[in-house]
Amino acid sequence: MARFDDPKQRPYKLPDLCTELNTSLQDVSIACVYCKATLERTEVYQFAFKDLCIVYRDCIAYAACHKCIDFYSRIRELRYYSNSVYGETLEKITNTELYNLLIRCLRCQKPLNPAEKRRHLKDKRRFHSIAGQYRGQCNTCCDQARQERLRRRRETQV
């Protein structure tokens, strides 16, 4: 991986890094900042799709793999949870429409799309303040959590 000594010249998004290195998303090789493993191609695509920022350690670019994103998202939730509010309350607090707010998923860190924000409003689900940022759940993580609850319920029933 190339070194970026000048912080002003560093790309902070994966597509920008690919442009700077004159490569493509499928050919870029980048390590996880936490576990140091090289991201697989699907993880590179997920990182770019989630619009996450690249971090630099000793002038070298790092991303984060799927397992580490899940793990450290949970740690951040446990350490920095502040409060939970409904969508209407969040709009009043921020004085901004819900659809104009950047709200990421609790687990996978994907930005919630308008349909996922609407689902929170319709189902009366709360948004959670974690480390000063409001979080919700994307459809994928919400469905996975529901499946996990059902599985646990079946295991505990006799």
UniProtKB/Swiss-Prot annotation:
Molecular functions per Gene Ontology:
DNA binding; PDZ domain binding; zinc ion binding
> Do the record's keywords include Membrane?
no
Q: Does the keyword Metal-binding apply?
A: yes
Among the Pfam families in the record, one is: E6
Indicate where this protein resides in the cell: Host cytoplasm; Host nucleus
SUPFAM superfamilies this protein is in? E6 C-terminal domain-like
- The main location class comes to host cell
ZnF endpoints (unnamed):
32-68, 105-141
Gene3D superfamilies given in the database record? E6 early regulatory protein (3.30.240.40)
Residue ranges annotated as motif PDZ-binding domain = 156-158
Annotated GO CC locations:
host cell cytoplasm; host cell nucleus
> Which family does this protein fall into?
Belongs to the papillomaviridae E6 protein family.
**Subunit structure and binding partners:** Forms homodimers. Interacts with ubiquitin-protein ligase UBE3A/E6-AP and thus forms a complex with human TP53. Interacts with human NFX1 and MAGI3. Interacts with human IRF3; this interaction inhibits the establishment of antiviral state. Interacts with human TYK2; this interaction inhibits JAK-STAT activation by interferon alpha. Interacts with host DLG1; this interaction leads to the proteasomal degradation of DLG1.
Q: Which HAMAP family match?
A: HPV_E6
| More details | Belongs to the high risk human alphapapillomavirus family. The cancer-causing human papillomavirus E6 protein has a unique carboxy terminal PDZ domain containing substrate.
Q: What is this protein called?
A: Protein E6
Organism listed in the record: Human papillomavirus 45
